[in-house]
């Protein structure tokens, strides 16, 4: 796997490196009201429902223009009634963004804040739901890319269902690779985006929700553009988007779906991403780097590494040296220790990940960093996290 246009690999959790044929699909223009484009929209919706496991026809897929955060806000504003109360499970930037969004929407919420990188567990969710009968909805992030943690969504869903509440999931950086089957995970709705694990390009996201929840959402949204019910209703009646759709992004997504199926769907994609992660972690450990999370919680999407303790290490320099070798990495988002992140998704495989490790080694040599071991405090922090989880 090598970008044919010479651009660097994007080792980020989306936008990511896409296949050449996915880029090529954007070379044609499409009429947004034309029958051919309406057929593409219908194929997009049915394909995503198939990936979600909706064999009973209880759910529907509503694509929406904009970034993933637009879709998260649309889901929250359309599916949570104004007099409802949400429990937000937060362990990173995207859980906190949900809390901020609910504040803008005027929706009451309680927050279970697990810090930067601890997972919410079923037992504590059950206790909070028992203690607060006001709570009607639970909102969870599937993969929190701030740290790379894969939250236990099955456990969260079981706890929520046991207590008779409704679950909304931000599966932005997980759906398509990490299993999210609505036959096994009881949820009211979830959202994801074109430019994540399906490996499309930015431009739209989608809400997959129970049809009953969509019907109940009529007239509830705070926004015309982000009204999931109205988008759903118009698409079902006309096959069209209400406002100008991202035609080129949709065309690219159709090609990305074809490649997704050729790879074996969710199972095949997860296998490649998980292998990417394992090859990366093993190689980085040989250089002295240590991952933040233990294997139990480490997602196949992005891995957080502690920054080396060596006094000559500077992330800004490291970043530029990696970029010169053809790799764009991510800065860290932890509050306790210095870190950086490397993504494992997109058009990359184990051979690319070995080249990433080699580029890291070259960068360390250039910087005069003999060993990438983290400070003792970071390892102690990891030990504490492992015990707490």
UniProtKB/Swiss-Prot annotation:
Keywords: Aminotransferase, Pyridoxal phosphate, Pyruvate, Transferase. The keyword Endoplasmic reticulum does not apply. The modification N6-(pyridoxal phosphate)lysine is found at residue 196. It catalyses: (2-aminoethyl)phosphonate + pyruvate = phosphonoacetaldehyde + L-alanine. GO terms for biological process: organic phosphonate catabolic process. GO terms for molecular function: 2-aminoethylphosphonate-pyruvate transaminase activity. Its cofactor is pyridoxal 5'-phosphate. InterPro entries: Aminotrans_V_dom, NH2EtPonate_pyrv_transaminase, PyrdxlP-dep_Trfase, PyrdxlP-dep_Trfase_major, PyrdxlP-dep_Trfase_small, SP_NH2Trfase/AEP_transaminase. It comes from the Bacteria. It holds the Pfam family Aminotran_5. Coiled coil: none annotated. Its EC number is 2.6.1.37. Gene3D superfamilies: Aspartate Aminotransferase, domain 1, Type I PLP-dependent aspartate aminotransferase-like (Major domain). The keyword Transcription regulation does not apply. Belongs to the class-V pyridoxal-phosphate-dependent aminotransferase family. PhnW subfamily. Involved in phosphonate degradation. Homodimer. This is 2-aminoethylphosphonate--pyruvate transaminase 1.
């Amino acid at each position: 796997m090598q970008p044919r246009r010479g651009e660097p690999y994007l080792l980020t959790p989306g936008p990511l490196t896409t296949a050449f044929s996915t880029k090529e699909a954007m070379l044609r223009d499409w009429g947004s009201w034309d029958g051919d484009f309406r057929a593409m929209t219908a194929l997009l919706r049915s394909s995503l429902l198939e990936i979600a496991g909706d064999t009973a026809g209880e759910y529907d897929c509503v694509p929406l223009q904009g970034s993933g955060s637009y879709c998260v806000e649309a889901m929250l504003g359309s599916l949570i009634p104004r007099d409802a109360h949400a429990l937000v499970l937060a362990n990173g930037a995207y859980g906190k963004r949900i809390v901020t969004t609910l504040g803008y929407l005027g929706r009451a919420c309680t927050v279970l804040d697990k810090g930067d990188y601890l997972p919410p567990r079923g037992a504590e969710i059950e206790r909070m739901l028992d203690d607060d009968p006001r709570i009607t909805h639970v909102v969870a992030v599937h993969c929190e890319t701030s740290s790379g943690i894969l939250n236990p969504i099955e456990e969260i869903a079981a706890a929520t269902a046991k207590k008779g509440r409704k679950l909304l999931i931000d599966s932005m950086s997980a759906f398509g690779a990490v299993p999210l089957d609505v036959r096994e995970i009881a949820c009211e709705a979830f959202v994801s985006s074109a430019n994540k694990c399906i490996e499309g390009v930015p431009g739209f996201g989608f809400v997959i929700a129970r049809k009953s929840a969509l019907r109940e959402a009529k007239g509830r949204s705070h926004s015309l553009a982000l009204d999931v019910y109205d988008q759903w209703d118009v698409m079902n009646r006309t096959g069209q988007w209400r406002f100008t759709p991202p035609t080129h992004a949709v065309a690219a997504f159709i090609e990305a779906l074809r490649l997704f199926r050729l790879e074996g769907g969710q199972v095949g994609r997860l296998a490649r991403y998980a292998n990417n992660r394992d090859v990366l972690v093993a190689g980085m450990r040989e250089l002295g780097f240590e991952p933040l999370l233990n294997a139990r919680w480490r997602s196949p999407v992005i891995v957080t590494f502690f920054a080396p303790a060596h006094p000559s290490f500077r992330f800004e320099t490291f970043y530029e040296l990696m970029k010169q070798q053809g790799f764009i990495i991510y800065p860290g988002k932890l509050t306790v220790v210095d870190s950086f992140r490397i993504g494992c998704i997109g058009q990359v495989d184990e051979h690319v990940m070995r080249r990433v490790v080699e580029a890291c080694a070259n960068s360390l040599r250039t910087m005069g960093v003999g060993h990438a071991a983290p400070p003792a405090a970071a390892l102690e922090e990891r030990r504490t996290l492992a015990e707490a989880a």
